Amino acid sequence: MKQIQHELIMPNEDLPFKMFIFEGREGNYIREKHWHRSIEIFAVFQGTLEFYLNDQEYLLGCGDFIIVNSNEVHSIHAPKENMTVVLQMSLDMFEKYYTGDQFICFAHAPQAQDEQLMEMICEMYMVYSDKKCGYDLKIQSLFYDMLYLSLIHISEPTRPIS
């Protein structure tokens, strides 16, 4: 039996989170089951991904994204070329929004705000790629707007398992 890997997430040097192009962009790629304490967003802009989250399959195409909650076991299969932006953020960013008996969990079902979130992620990545003067401020502005939208429209309060 294969052991499920724990992935340690480190933010970009110039941002309070990690943003990058998915390493399986050339296709023919499998990322085995793993987990981390961070919250992760996979936003597909071209191509498709087969995403497995808690043993449930999600087929992601252009314009789709999925949010992986902290400690959720997931794996990814990218059979063909794709353009997917990945955001990884520390759970600490949401610390003041949960208490000892209530945690934040993000829904996996499609939401009305999906298009707006995809536009924000796209703009964040384009600004980051250009790295013009003040890029970090613009990215952080978009990032915090995205967090707000996610918190208000996509989060579901949950209780810890006793």
Where are these regions (language model features)?
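Single conserved hydrophobic/aromatic residue that forms the stacking wall/gate
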Residues: 152-162
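Amphipathic alpha-helical segments enriched in hydrophobic/aromatic residues interleaved with Lys/Arg
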Residues: 100-150
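Ligand-binding loop in jelly-roll beta-barrel domains
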Residues: 70-93
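Conserved metal-binding segment of the jelly-roll/cupin
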Residues: 60-73
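Conserved segment of winged-helix/HTH DNA-binding domains
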Residues: 89-104
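A structure-centric signal for secondary-structure junctions around beta-strands
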Residues: 16, 38, 62, 81-83, ...
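Generic protein-terminus/edge-of-domain signal
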Residues: 1-59, 105
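Histidine-centered divalent metal-coordination motifs
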Residues: 34-36, 74, 153
